[in-house]
Regions:
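Periplasmic/extracellular electron-transfer cofactor-ligation site
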Residues: 45-68, 130-139, 428-445, 618-619, ...
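Long, His/Glu/Asp-enriched segments that create or flank divalent metal/ion-associated functional microenvironments
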Residues: 654-678, 682-716
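Sequence/structural segment immediately N-terminal to covalent heme-attachment motifs in c-type
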Residues: 35-52, 120-128, 417-433, 564, ...
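Catalytic cores of secreted or luminal carbohydrate-active enzymes
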Residues: 115-135, 712-719, 723, 727-728
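Solvent-exposed helix-loop boundary motif
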Residues: 21-122, 139-166, 174-237, 267, ...
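Primarily short, surface-exposed interaction patches in extracytoplasmic proteins
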Residues: 235-306, 311, 317-664, 703-704, ...
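Bacterial N-terminal signal peptides
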Residues: 8-16
Length: 799
């Protein structure tokens, strides 16, 4: 029996279509044939009809469902022409099509009016319906997109320029599809872009222009040169400057002059070791006539023990050193978090090649090829050391690999590991691809689940799947620990530490791609399959691919993180978001840094030295008329907030005190905040870390660490008892200055040098002297002066 639905579908296909006409496009061309995939689906995507918040949601909207982001043309064609008894299109009377009536507001539509009846968009839909609402499968398969201009769109101030997008399709034909694209610009203060790709300049600078067309993405930079005379440039110190200056020439931006010696000294000391230079160091550096003094300073700071601690802290963020996720009880987790930090610190201190460090994380096991008895003895020794020192100074950093990376209180699904590894070592965010291909990125569900399945053999458990010899050795050690705990009057539960193993298991866990309901073959991102053979650890092949010189992400991701640390903003920003829609602000510089890094054998210290000794790093934060709007081309130093750990250490450095770590947070005397590995602290310092944005390290996203200024940060410096106590410390800076035999002028100068790393200006000196001389006591004068200085914006920011 013929159903009404089938009859309606047959009528759509059989009845003679309405009269048709060419469509005049807003970019000046004429569209003579409307194609469902190329044009109709392009406009559905551009209008947002197939997004997750509209008809692309799993449930659809008001009975009408499209495929998410238009990835399934067959489904969408059926939804438009067959569902709802075919009422959405009317080939005999196209204007009566529900598709058009809702879009123009003639019929109630939750999405509101999407376009007007007189618009070219209406004409495209109308002509498609009038032509029989046909679909040619595969007609819109995209081979590539080409953009004119292909790299930089230079637009003079207050002028406009049209961007042209050409699609080459799988059948070999090409077409100008500019009006069917969606255009997004990263900074509307620099330029704006209209719906059909016309870019209008607003102020000097550059912005990223992202162009989307039915799942394909291309991007370019919009350049708005500064007006006026041609920019001038100093002699480059190295290749970094040459490539930065090349970009600035396009922008006609003259870089700022060099920072003063005092500013440079403060900047680089905070960046490299999270400390302030002493007053004596500031005076000596400013007076030193040696033309190589900055070079010598950088070399000294890069070799400083605290420099390794700074990068161990950053790498703890990157690798997910989350104390809460480690084995409990809490004191055990904190100790192991510290050991994790110290393992990373030793590798930075020893300048181990970065690719080796990453391989030693990705392929980590507990045994490291040792006999089970050796492993048990090492584990016992480390645990005993950790119990005495709260995790500091153990032998764990001498372990060849970082098995703590894989040790978690709760079992981790394979997809959690893939997201962590991609974000940490490739700068790639995969989360969206778990459910669908994001319209601004390349990764599909098959990419996501295939990459996840590489981690199907890594195991951390109570040795039930371990080799017999390992199981026996661990069982004996655990029994001995239990006996010792009970003999000491402790309960035999978490009071003793179970010996557990991270290893490559014969038990393979493989996840299905929910889109196909089939197991996705393990493979590297966008690359070859990883075959599970015998007892081979698939992570070895993963590590080889990740650290390969040909990997398009590995070296770039790390040099970008280094650049972002020293400049406050990455060449790709956010630093863990390398994607098609987020191109670098200076691609040639990023490529050159990565190439140099690879050729150096992944020498991190050499990379840092290159960056720190560039003229670019040494520029002043003070701007000129041509670069005052610059936010991402490094024509001047950017004023930037400190990391939370730097805030604590810089405050202590200025106030001449050490942080007090006690109880579960206990640390050796004199320990700096950047030397502490635990992400979960309990003392007074925990509040300061939280309000200044230290991350809990619970997700694989750099966005966890916040650098945004907030009122609690200001109130903390102004009123918190912790600051008051440090100001009043008997051996602290205030007491030292108050007791010293200094004139009023000398007191003011020393206070400025100790906090702002410079001498006061004439106005600052006069104002300070007035307050000092009005105070009732020398101690009161000194306390008020130092308190005022640490509450300045200049103090809490790096510039």
């Amino acid at each position: 029996m013929t159903t009404p639905r089938l009859l309606a579908a047959a009528l759509v296909c059989a009845l003679a279509p309405a009269a048709r006409a060419d469509v005049t496009l807003p970019t000046g061309g004429t569209l003579r044939h409307v194609d469902f995939e190329r044009h109709v689906m392009g406009l559905l995507s551009k209008a947002g009809c197939n997004t997750g918040g509209c008809h692309g949601s799993f449930q659809g909207k008001n009975g009408f469902r499209l495929s998410l982001f238009g990835y399934e043309p067959a489904m969408d064609h059926a939804a438009l022409t067959r569902d709802n008894l075919g009422r959405r299109v009317n080939v005999l009377q196209p204007h009566d099509s529900l598709l058009l009536q809702k879009a123009v507001g003639s019929v109630a539509h939750d999405g509101g009016m999407r376009f007007g009846r007189d618009s070219w968009v209406y004409a495209v839909f109308r002509e498609w319906v009038a032509g029989g609402a046909r679909w040619t499968p595969g007609s819109g398969a995209i081979a590539k997109l080409t953009v004119t201009p292909d790299n930089f769109a230079v637009v003079a101030a207050d002028q406009s320029r049209q961007v042209k997008v050409t699609a080459t399709f799988a059948d070999g034909t090409s077409e100008d599809i500019t009006p069917f694209c969606d255009f997004k610009i990263s900074d509307e203060a620099i330029a704006s872009v209209d719906a059909v790709g016309r870019v209008t300049a607003r102020q000097p600078g550059d912005a990223g222009l992202t162009i989307l067309y039915r799942g394909a993405v291309v991007a370019l930079r919009v350049i708005v040169p500064a007006p006026g005379a041609p920019a001038t440039f100093p002699q480059p110190a190295n290749f970094v400057d040459g490539l930065v200056f090349d970009k600035l020439r396009l922008l006609n931006m003259t870089p700022s002059g060099p920072a003063s010696d005092e500013v440079f000294l403060r900047r680089v000391t905070i960046d490299t070791i999270a400390q302030l230079p002493t007053a004596a160091e500031v005076k000596a550096f400013a007076a030193d006539p040696d033309p190589r003094k900055r070079e010598k300073l950088v070399d000294k700071l890069l070799a400083h023990p605290l420099h390794a601690a700074v990068w161990a802290t950053k790498l703890s963020d990157i690798t997910g050193n989350n104390t809460t996720a480690l084995e409990q009880p809490q004191n055990t987790a904190q100790r192991r978090s510290q050991m994790w930090h110290d393992w990373l610190r030793k590798r930075v201190q020893d300048n181990v090649a970065y690719d080796k460090t990453v391989r030693d994380i990705l392929t980590a096991t507990s045994l490291d090829g040792r006999a089970p008895e050796e492993w048990v003895a090492f584990t016992r020794r480390v645990d005993e050391q950790a119990e005495k020192t709260n995790g500091y100074g153990t032998d764990y950093p001498n372990k060849p690999t970082l098995d703590l990376f894989w040790r978690r209180q709760q079992a981790q699904p394979v997809e959690a590991w893939s997201e962590k590894v991609a974000a940490a070592f490739l700068g790639v965010r995969l989360e969206c691809a778990q459910c669908h291909k994001h319209p601004t990125d390349r990764w599909t569900q098959e990419d996501y689940w295939g990459f996840a399945n590489i981690f199907g053999t890594v195991t951390f458990a109570n040795n039930q799947y371990s080799a017999p010899a390992v199981k026996d050795a661990a069982a004996k050690e655990n029994a001995d620990r239990k006996t010792a705990a009970e003999a000491g009057g402790k309960k035999a539960n978490n009071q003793f530490l179970l010996v557990k193993e991270v290893f490559n298991s014969a038990q393979v866990k493989q996840a299905k791609n929910p889109g196909t309901n089939k197991i996705a073959p393990a493979r590297v991102l966008g690359g070859e399959r990883v075959v599970f053979v015998g007892g081979d650890d698939p992570r070895v092949k993963l590590a080889e691919w990740v650290t390969s010189p040909t990997n398009p992400f590995f070296a770039k991701s790390f040099v970008n993180r280094v650049w972002a640390h020293y400049f406050g903003v990455g060449l790709v920003n956010p630093v863990d978001d390398f994607s098609l829609a987020n191109p670098p602000t200076n691609a040639k510089l990023l490529d050159a840094l990565a190439d140099s890094f690879v050729k150096s054998g992944y020498d991190v210290r050499k990379l840092e030295r290159t960056v720190l000794l560039s003229r670019t790093y040494g520029l002043s934060f003070q701007t000129n008329d041509s670069n005052k709007f610059d936010k991402n081309n490094f024509s001047h130093s950017y004023i930037r907030p400190l990391l939370a750990e730097q805030v604590v250490d810089v405050l202590n450095s200025a106030l001449g005190v050490d942080e007090q770590f006690a109880g579960q947070d206990a640390a050796p005397a004199g320990t700096k905040m950047v030397e502490v590995g635990s992400s979960r602290l309990n003392g007074n310092v925990a509040y300061a870390l939280r309000i200044f944005g230290r991350p809990p390290r619970t997700t694989a996203c750099d966005c966890e660490r916040s650098a945004e200024p907030a009122l609690p940060q200001t109130l903390f410096r102004m009123t918190d008892p912790t600051i008051s106590n440090k100001l009043a410390a008997g051996t602290g800076r205030v007491q030292q200055l108050a007791k010293a035999k200094l004139s009023d002028e000398e007191l003011v100068e020393e206070a400025f040098l100790a906090t702002l790393s410079r001498r006061p200006t004439a106005d600052e000196k006069a104002s300070s002297l007035t307050h000092v001389r009005a105070a009732r006591t020398r101690l009161e004068a000194t306390t008020d002066l130092v308190w005022a200085l640490i509450n300045t914006r200049e103090f809490i920011l790096n510039h």
